């Protein structure tokens, strides 16, 4: 038997009903923010791929009007840069963190972007979905959300595992491109408290991180969810279901008598924007990859969506008081009418940053927080990230985090779990002046593979030996020497097989000491560091971390040379070099 209820988004008093055997519906007082009554009318969709986006240069930037916390930070980069006091000290101290890139998309066991790819006929995630759940005209992503319960999820145990691995900050996905909020969202009924596990996941992660003095960041990836879902409005082109629409076309009225009665699919899938193309036949869903433009016939809806985008971020900020927040995308800032910001041009991103900093000042008496805009390069008042790639130079003009996933951004089979990839990534990033966050795979049930658990323990053992040279360190005057760099991309066996040699060395510094990181152990035990030749200044002592006592060394015009005997750890090794004002030898 299936239980249902009827709930108007404005006046409902009961939670959506769920399949038989699950928890009974719970009474609640829904937020007015859930309603679509203020959304502008949307024109009927034109033929797929029939329109080119308009030139952004012909459109003025829209100044948004939603309220933000009062304070000195105004929503302009000039004001934000003027008042921002600088990168918090804790950011540099933390150095190594985890990216909890997890949510219902793990249900597909198909890696990243499963929610969209399940609607792409013929692709592996779509085939997996049909085999495991059914056809997306009958069982679409909304139904995946309902089925996702994460019964093994234990935020306390997982957070402890990350902390034991040496991770000192935690980045957690609040909402991905799938448009599903993983908190008790005021502005979106498609959230983890209403649909699926019925838990405030961001609330739990935040609580456990703060118990362990881990800095907490919520990440938001929904800027382009309003056009990312265009595939959900399609239909199969072949086979027995050819022409049968997927579930993106459903409306609130279609839910009567179903488990999702009272939930409007438009608040999940948004609207059909498949009419826009990039001029080469690519659909709107490909615009983020090298394209730009304004969706000229949907500007009213775009403004409405951009406001909700911002209000959702501010809702989570106000509820969970994070140390950082992060917006995803590959454009210079959200809603910039280019790349992932295509479609609309407004100042919503700056308003959210100003709100965050003003709120921090009012609540804590100082701005000890950091906003991250993924590709906002060169702006000292916000951080940025490097996704699956390592910069080729030291970057100190703004705070930044290097980020990469083990295998892929969401759970999948046959990932390579080897702590050497975490160690090498950490060293490559911190030697260039950044922090490092690794996305550790969590399965649909909320647990980790045994091999992943073992990897984290191995990482923790390595950090016990070398952590003092990691936390609070900064880039030296030179990031390294040698010719080999770890390949870009998600972490796999490819990175494990990186052919480092004893000539590949990285550098950091802390408290007047230079740390030389050996990316490979010398087969004959002899190490020569050319950057620490006599022209670098006088070296007074050298110590191998994890090995008691100083090492005998020789400093010549050719380099600093010493012989090592016993490995105190695995993966990479650190020499602590003392001297006065050491600078790289030319």
Where are these regions (language model features)?
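Positively charged n-region of N-terminal signal peptides that target proteins for export
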Residues: 1-6
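Mature catalytic domains of secreted/periplasmic carbohydrate-active enzymes
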Residues: 23-586
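Bacterial N-terminal signal peptides
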Residues: 7-19
């Amino acid at each position: 038997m299936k239980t249902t209820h009827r709930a108007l988004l404005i006046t409902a008093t009961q939670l959506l009903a769920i399949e038989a055997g699950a928890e009974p519906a719970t009474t609640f007082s829904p937020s007015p923010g859930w309603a679509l009554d203020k959304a502008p009318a949307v024109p009927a969709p034109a033929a797929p791929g029939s329109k080119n986006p308009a030139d952004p240069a012909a459109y003025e930037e829209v100044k948004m009007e939603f309220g933000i916390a009062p304070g000195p930070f105004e929503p302009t980069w000039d004001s934000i840069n003027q008042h921002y006091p600088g990168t918090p000290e804790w950011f540099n101290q933390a150095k190594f963190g985890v990216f909890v890139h997890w949510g219902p998309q793990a249900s597909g066991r198909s890696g990243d972007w499963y929610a969209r790819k399940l609607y792409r006929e013929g692709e592996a995630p779509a085939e997996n979905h049909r085999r495991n759940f059914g056809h997306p005209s009958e069982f679409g992503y909304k139904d995946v959300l309902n089925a996702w319960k994460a019964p093994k999820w234990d935020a306390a145990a997982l957070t402890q595992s990350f902390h034991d691995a040496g991770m000192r900050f935690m980045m957690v996905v609040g909402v991905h491109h799938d448009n599903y909020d993983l908190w008790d969202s005021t502005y979106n009924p498609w959230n983890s408290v209403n649909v699926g596990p019925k838990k405030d996941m961001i609330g739990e992660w935040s609580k456990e991180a703060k118990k362990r003095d881990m800095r907490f960041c919520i990440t938001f990836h929904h800027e382009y969810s309003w056009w990312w879902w265009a595939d959900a409005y399609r239909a199969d082109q072949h086979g027995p279901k050819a022409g049968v629409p997927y579930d993106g076309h459903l409306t609130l009225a279609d839910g009567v008598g179903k488990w999702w009665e009272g939930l409007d699919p438009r608040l999940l899938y948004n609207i059909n924007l498949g009419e826009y193309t990039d001029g080469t036949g690519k659909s709107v869903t490909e615009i983020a990859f090298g394209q730009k433009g304004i969706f000229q016939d949907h500007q009213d809806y775009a403004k409405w969506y951009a406001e909700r985008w911002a209000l959702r971020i501010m809702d989570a900020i106000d509820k969970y008081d994070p140390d950082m927040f992060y917006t995803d995308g590959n454009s210079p800032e959200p809603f910039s009418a280019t790349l992932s910001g295509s479609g609309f041009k407004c100042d919503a991103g700056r308003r959210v940053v100003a709100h965050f900093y003003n709120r921090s000042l009012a609540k804590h008496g100082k701005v000890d927080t950091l906003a991250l805009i993924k590709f906002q390069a060169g702006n000292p008042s916000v951080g940025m990230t490097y996704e699956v790639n390592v910069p080729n130079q030291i970057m100190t003009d703004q705070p930044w985090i290097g980020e990469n996933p083990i295998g892929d951004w969401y759970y999948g089979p046959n990932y390579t779990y080897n702590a050497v990839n975490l160690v090498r990534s950490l060293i490559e990033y911190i030697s260039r002046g950044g922090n490092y966050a690794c996305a550790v795979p969590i399965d649909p049930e909320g647990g980790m593979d045994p091999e992943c658990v073992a990897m984290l323990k191995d990482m923790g053992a390595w950090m016990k030996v070398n952590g003092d040279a990691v936390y609070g360190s900064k880039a030296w005057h030179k990031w390294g020497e040698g010719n080999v760099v770890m390949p870009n991309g998600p972490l796999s066996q490819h990175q494990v097989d990186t052919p480092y040699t004893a000539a590949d060395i990285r550098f950091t510094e802390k408290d007047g000491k230079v740390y030389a990181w050996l990316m490979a152990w010398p087969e004959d035990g002899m190490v020569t560091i050319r950057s620490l030749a006599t022209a670098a200044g006088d070296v007074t002592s050298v110590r191998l971390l994890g090995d008691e006592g100083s090492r005998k060394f020789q400093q010549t015009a050719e380099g600093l040379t010493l012989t090592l005997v016993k490995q105190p750890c695995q993966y990479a090794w650190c020499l602590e070099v003392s001297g006065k004002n050491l600078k790289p030898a030319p």
